[in-house]
Design a protein with these regions (language model features):
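Positively charged n-region of N-terminal signal peptides that target proteins for export
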Residues: 1-4
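Low-complexity, Ser/Thr/Pro/Gly-rich disordered linker/stalk regions
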Residues: 21-309
Length: 309
């Protein structure tokens, strides 16, 4: 009898585990104001089409978590925990793009601004997000591991990625790929004219929050893009920042090249918080919450402004 009772109790504990089972995420998601501010649109989340017509994702994929439960939080009381495991692919509807069958194949759990809405990311904008990678984050041999990107609505080469590589964090640009001389042609992030710049070393990256602030003018002619990391201006680009007649969307989560069988469990976990957006004015971001001053940020310069020659 005691053995049977033990089995029943264990079963109840497993069923109550918040990271067990699957959830349908075909509908858009409204994220809490404690975490996301300024974005008027709702969000979609990567999922996998099933034969019964639902788009499903494991419920460990993302969780709204609380500081009171021991989770890291940058400001306020909550953050978003995202987990990606080996084989987690995205295909939003039958016959659409499939991560698993792509060339090269990929895996993702990623939030994106609702794709069917008119993008608010036009003209001059300001953005922030804060990212926390646990100290025990594994080194995974993946072709790329993206944790935040500014992506075109239609064109398939995102101009700005932030990537984990080994124990370091990099800014990766494909601004050359949207330049008139390379538009609609084969173009890789490794080509001269694009940028791959290390922005955080391992001792700065793991087990602590890192803040990213962006200011851009999204233009198919003379735009600009600036990035601050933990309050320091590290990158400034001047030139085309968006494809003509296209728009820009922000995506965050984990998007990576396929992890193969010889690379352990292949599990990544990352926390996001303070995802903020404002048009034109830095002051609307309320960066004092995070310990920054708009006037201090805007007065900073870099030794070299990046341009496409």
């Amino acid at each position: 009898m005691k053995k049977l009772l033990g089995i029943v109790v264990l079963g109840l504990l497993l069923c109550s585990n918040s990271f067990a089972g699957k959830m349908a995420v075909k509908k858009t998601i409204k994220l809490p104001k404690d975490i996301v501010q300024g974005y008027k649109n709702k969000w979609n989340f990567s999922c996998t089409w099933t034969e019964n017509g639902k788009c499903m994702t494991p419920d460990y994929a993302y969780q709204i978590v609380n500081e009171t439960d021991g989770h890291p939080v940058r400001f306020g009381k909550q953050s978003i925990r995202i987990e990606l495991r080996k084989g987690d692919c995205h295909q939003r509807r039958k016959g659409s793009y499939n991560d698993c069958k792509a060339s090269p194949p990929s895996e993702r759990h990623e939030f994106g601004m609702e794709y069917d809405d008119v993008s608010p990311i036009r003209g001059i904008t300001w953005h922030t997000y804060s990212l926390y990678l646990p100290k025990d984050t594994p080194q995974i041999n993946s072709e790329w591991i993206t944790m935040g990107q500014f992506h075109n609505l239609d064109y398939n080469k995102p101009p700005i990625n932030l990537d984990l590589s080994g124990k370091h964090f990099y800014l990766v640009t494909r601004l050359l790929c949207i330049h008139p001389k390379k538009l609609n042609k084969r173009c890789y992030s490794t080509e001269p004219g694009n940028t791959r710049e290390k922005i955080l070393d391992s001792e700065e990256l793991f087990g602590q929050w890192n803040d990213f602030i962006f200011n851009a003018k999204w233009s198919s002619k003379e735009g600009f893009f600036k990035m601050w990391v933990n309050g320091k201006l590290l990158y400034h680009f001047v030139g085309r920042t968006v494809v003509p007649k296209d728009g820009t969307m922000f995506k965050f989560g984990i998007y990576r090249g396929k992890v193969y069988s010889g690379d352990g469990e292949g599990t990544h976990i990352v926390y996001y918080d303070e995802i903020r957006y404002a048009k034109k004015s830095c002051k609307k971001l309320k960066l004092e919450d995070l310990g920054y001053s708009c006037s201090d940020l805007e007065n900073q310069t870099v030794s070299r402004i990046d341009k496409i020659k």
